[in-house]
Amino acid sequence: MKRPPVPARRPAPLRRSDIPAAGPARRVSGTGSVLSAILDHGPVARSNVARLTGLSPAAVTGHVGQLLARGLVREGAETAGPTGLGRPHIPVEIDTGRYLVAGAHVAVAHSTVSLMDLRGRVVAEDRQPHALGATGPYATVLGRSPRGLSSGPALLRDLADRLPRLVEEHAAGRTVLALGFATGHRVDPAAGVVVEHPHLGWRDVPVREILETATGLPVHVDSHSRALARAEQLFGEASTRVSTVLLFVGAVVDAAFASSGNMHLGPRSGAGSVAHLPLGSGGSGGAEPCSCGRTGCLQSEVSERAMVRRAAEQGLFVGSFAELLDGALAGDERALGLFRRRALLVGRAAALLLDMFDPEVLVVVEPGAGRLPECLADLRAEVARRSWVCDDPERTVVPSSFTGSVLATAGGAVALGALYDDPLGPWPALPAVS
């Protein structure tokens, strides 16, 4: 006699205590608002800063005094009022002659250490391939048998060891205030931890602790997508300041979302995990198997590894993704065709994100969109075909403001974002102010 089937056990209802607390929203101090206004509009008179920020003239005068005391801004030459009448103005602007920030970015195949000034300009960078050693599931982007990457702590200590020489050769007497660190996948900025980076084989790596011990600098940690979205807010086009989606397409594919100027992190630091959006193969060839076991995921179709594999299938054998890009830039039709196919798939993903979030701007961080006009046109055309809410892709979908220096910008932008949010915070290299 058959037993009656046991009914499926219903999952216990989710309790509030089961959900990790979300990190605090980014709150810009009054002094931070003044510093950002000076960044955007300087050299600018204090009276204009008051109008730009909505703060009282007396408050602005106090904030500017603190910023001058910390050496973050400087005064320019006295100028007459706009009509030649009234009191003269002494404009203020960002002082780029005293301080720098350092940046570090870890990609799948290489790492980058950089220096940036307080206007977000890259002063110097040093990119090195990873040393091979401990095992890891995606040691290369070329599809060879993975031999693994250096362990997380060892790689981070190598980054720290490379920084002093960069400072010695390029700082020109300026003091480094802090180190910003960025990488892909899930990063918890409040804890300073890389929660999970499957391509590197990293899980719960205490980046801040390791780098602060190794460098003696304050260390700020975030995902590269959020870092680049913050860089767009600070130093990019004005249209990217308030409501932005940023889509990063490289060896890793992920995204960042900003609303009312604040980045959305998520309670598990997982906001922007778009790698497994199911998009299919774009109608050309079989879909690339994904690490998740499915086919047609966004990352498995458009990642650098997938691009190099597809090139080999077409008889175009290249040693790296960079070599494939060089071919496309030089006019190789097969290489260009691969980037145009990629642009269509990225456009399909962009259309989904536009319909989900309806941002003012969607920034695409992808070298084809940034350097190959045909690819940007194809991407925008695909958005026009597929998005229900985007009625002007030419205005809404834009390439990165940092094409050519994306990874060098990402790490430093983490530190600069923290500085512009709270310039009176605990910055040991800055003079104390009351």
Predicted regions and their residues:
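Short, acidic, Ser/Thr-enriched surface-loop or helix-capping motifs
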Residues: 117, 189, 258
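Gly/Ser/Thr-rich active-site cleft segment
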Residues: 176-207
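Glycine/GP-enriched mid-protein hinge/lid loop-to-helix segment characteristic of carbohydrate kinases
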Residues: 125-127, 136-155, 202-203, 209-326
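ATP-binding/phosphotransfer module of carbohydrate and carboxylate kinases, centering on a glycine-rich
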Residues: 1-175, 286-289, 294-434
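A short, glycine/Asx- and small/polar-enriched loop/turn
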Residues: 85-88, 189, 239
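Short secondary-structure boundary segments
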Residues: 183, 249-251, 366-367
